[in-house]
Amino acid sequence: MSQPTVNGSALIPLPYAPNWENGINLSYTFETAQFVSEQSTEQRRPLQSRERRIMEVDYLLDGTEAQQMMYDLAHGKDKVFGVPIYPETLIVSGFGYQLLSVVNALDYWNLNNYADYIFLFEPVSRLYETVELSGLGDTVIVAEYILQESFTANKTYVYPLFFGYLTTEPVLEPYTDQLYTVSLTFAEYLDGG
């Protein structure tokens, strides 16, 4: 699978919890080209190696978080984002040497088939880390390297990750006098673009 090279700060993380009330729309597109032969028969051919993931997500953030997110989005408008696939949330029940204990990891399509990276996020302490995936079992996720952060068991979420780019301008709207909603749409990079 062809993926962008991730080095240092090239990947912009999204360490924010989604607004589950509005739902998360994860869809798939597959681009093809139609060819017509001299006998007027039609044939479709794929223009990409597999389907492209598109994710529409809303975040409900306080003023400081909304300001930080808008700064990250302005900085990263033409860069690669690490987009967590929120519908495939797993809770980490324990940590070991490059191991994360989870339940039913093999039940998640994106984690099993397309994930090269995972995103760990502990909302209370705001810790997060992007980790390359080395192996996967039903009750364990193996990271390529030792985790840099000290996460807490049963308070840390792990998501499969895809590399994406913003397809529309971020929409920032007031929700209350202290909360804001930020609406984003990401498309996956495939085969270099």
Where are these regions (language model features)?
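Extracellular/virion structural assembly segments
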Residues: M1-D138, V142-G193
